[in-house]
Amino acid sequence: MEKFEREIKESKFSELLNKHFAASAIPKGIHCLSLRLTDEYSSNAHARKQLPSPELLPLLSDNSYHHFVLSTDNILAASVVVTSTVQSSLIPEKIVFHIITDKKTYAGMHSWFALNPIPAIIEVKGLHQFDWLTRENVPVLEAVENHKGIRDYYHGNHIVGSNLSETTPHKFASKLQARSPRYISLLNHIRIYLPEMFPNLNKAVFLDDDIVVQRDLSPLWDIDLKGKVNGAVETCKGEDTWVMSKRFRNYFNFSHPLIAKNLDPNECAWAYGMNIFDLRAWRKKNIRDIYHFWLKENLKSNLTMWKLGTLPPALIAFKGYVHPIDPSWHMLGLGYQDKTDIEAVKKAAVIHYNGDSKPWSDIGFEHLRPVWTKYVDYSNDFIRNCHIMES
């Protein structure tokens, strides 16, 4: 019996490890889409047309419009975020989307939105087009990229250092979740520079690429943040262990003296992924410097303060500057658990597939995928030719 139990446990660990690698990989169809659109950019003048057209350029900094920022290298995911936002809007012509991507994806991303116009204003920018965003100006970026401990942690052997005989599958799954390579991507950290990236904007809504918008979001601009910087849904009021019952103790190592001295383990956490930012209020605070300071301290302490991505330093940097918004604005967890209540999903303004089981991957939950796929245009030639099939 002990032998069988050990084999079952080892099999579960193997399953979790395979799932982790599946979640980290780029699906073949999405990779194909990026390559074909990049090729189109070089051969088709229509794919290179200016976005937005010259007469609309002043609207990119017009504060009477609703500005959304999306940072991603996933073209298909970006198209779903933009399409769902526009289709759910009562006034799509008042929407401005600022899409930020990396250098390798820029041409393909630009091609997609140039060839598939929508009734909103679209801007596509590559990180390489922000002159001030260099490793010299932001030294912590170079440190994050080149730190050996970080490279080993996110790209090394995920079994070494894990005592499988003394851990549970649940704990092992949590550790794997914390080791996703996307957590050290500059595209993931870029939101901390929003005031510098958009110096003329007063407010902006930041959206992750694994969300779907189901309701008009224009009322977000009417929410009084009461002088705070970040309007976000709190994630400490629910009962499920994966998503909505998170406090600072879930993210930080309180045996570290610097953490124990500065933070309260019972303080409520909040969600990244759909945030309304008051950029005017933000510019008066030193949020970015605090973020950088704690990133550096965690590097110095060999990642012993926290492991999981960009949320922990943001929890510290925005401490005292977060205004809770109604939970119906942002429902999380669709990439974690397959028991998600479909009726609750239908009522949420924004649903978030945070977690490993993304709707565009093979390990996405079947009953939650149609809410995402209904915003994919399967008649599009590029999507058909890359065999991105409707499930």
Q: Predicted segment positions?
A:
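Glycosyltransferase catalytic domains, chiefly GT-A lineage
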Residues: M1-S391
